[in-house]
């Protein structure tokens, strides 16, 4: 019973960490990363389709992404989708390839992005702590129903806390890495 709670807790904390990584990956650094365009949806015959399904995105150099569209007729639609995204990018097409130069980030913009990253990190930590609270509530319910002893409860809560601490540490590592990435360029 307790092992199931621990496994569920770990799975939910892992999902919270992955969600945080996904949110943070969308925050633009000065370096060209293909994942930057992952959230872009292109109008493909009347339906919104992810850019990744319609084109190949690669980092041409440190400041330029190259988007190779599979269907030539979609070049303008892809270019428009990139232009109208909230990323502030200005694509230019040459044949079947669209080049997306990334403007350098100002010091002020970097600081704003770091604040956003820290806010996302705090939300990630709150999500992890909520998972811990749910697990501890389940353990207390087992104690109340006399399915486990007080010693088992204390031991289980300590193990849940260790799992929580390890995931909070992982969140801090992800945040530190992103901040370093933002300030290095």
Curated annotation (Swiss-Prot):
Disulfide bonds: none
GO cellular component: cytosol
Highest taxon above the source species: Bacteria
UniProt record, GO biological process: cytoplasmic translational termination
InterPro entries associated with the record: Ribosome_recyc_fac, Ribosome_recyc_fac_dom, RRF_sf
GO molecular function list: ribosomal large subunit binding
HAMAP family: RRF
Principal place of residence: cytoplasm
SUPFAM superfamilies (UniProt xref): Ribosome recycling factor, RRF
Stated role: Responsible for the release of ribosomes from messenger RNA at the termination of protein biosynthesis. May increase the efficiency of translation by recycling ribosomes from one round of translation to another.
The keyword Cytoplasm belongs to this UniProt entry's keyword annotation: yes
PANTHER family (alphabetical): MITOCHONDRIAL RIBOSOME RECYCLING FACTOR PSEUDO 1 (PTHR20982:SF3), RIBOSOME RECYCLING FACTOR (PTHR20982)
Protein name: Ribosome-recycling factor
Similarity field: Belongs to the RRF family.
NCBIfam families on file: frr (TIGR00496)
Keywords, in A-Z order: Cytoplasm, Protein biosynthesis
Localisation: Cytoplasm
Segment forming the signal sequence: none
Gene designation per UniProt: frr
């Amino acid at each position: 019973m307790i092992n199931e709670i621990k496994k569920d807790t770990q799975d939910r904390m892992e999902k919270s960490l992955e969600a945080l990584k996904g949110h943070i990956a969308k925050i633009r650094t000065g370096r060209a990363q293909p994942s930057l365009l992952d959230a872009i949806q292109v109008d493909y015959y009347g339906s919104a389709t992810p850019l990744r399904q319609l084109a190949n995105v690669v980092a041409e150099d440190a400041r330029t992404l190259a988007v190779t569209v599979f269907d030539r007729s979609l070049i303008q639609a892809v270019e428009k989708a990139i232009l109208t995204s909230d990323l502030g990018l200005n694509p230019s097409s040459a044949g079947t390839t669209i080049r997306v130069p990334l403007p350098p980030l100002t010091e002020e913009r970097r600081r704003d992005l770091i604040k956003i990253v820290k806010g996302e990190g705090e939300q990630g930590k709150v999500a992890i702590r909520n998972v811990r609270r749910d697990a501890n509530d389940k353990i207390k319910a087992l104690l109340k129903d006399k399915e486990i002893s007080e010693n088992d409860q204390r031991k289980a809560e300590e193990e849940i806390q260790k799992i929580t601490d390890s995931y909070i540490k992982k969140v801090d590592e992800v945040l530190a890495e992103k901040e370093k990435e933002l300030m290095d360029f």
